[in-house]
């Protein structure tokens, strides 16, 4: 006798009605917490600085370009093909490379650069996270291989948290092969819990938030 037959026998003996299927209640919808732009900037800054990252706010694209120039201090940098970097004229800086004849030259430049410069598709305020969607404009190598990473991001791309990101990108697979979330500099620890930065990626990260 299977389980349902046994239970039916018990119900009949007790004079009870047949069991009715009970539908599961719908999952509760938790709305995204909304805060002001200034609150998001403050939250993002605090979260990233807690992870040894750095946040610089710029009032214009021109100021952002000059800030990048100052951070580079004549050292070599490689920039992604993000259209926002071009709009900020960062790819026009004399010590920033952004165009290469082939993939081999591109990889070599990434390995030799002191800085990798990207934008970001989004930034998450509550964790100080950059969201990088791989594609024609953004390459993972620029944000991964150089020892220092500079991300230039317009404030309008600053979201509250991961929940809001999922609402913006409900099906990431439709757009790209990967989506990378970068939270602070690369860090790792051995069995003795000795923390080391920069082993598996950039040991320094600076995010320049630009007012739209």
Predicted regions and their residues:
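The feature marks the mature, well-folded catalytic cores of soluble enzymes
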Residues: 1-212
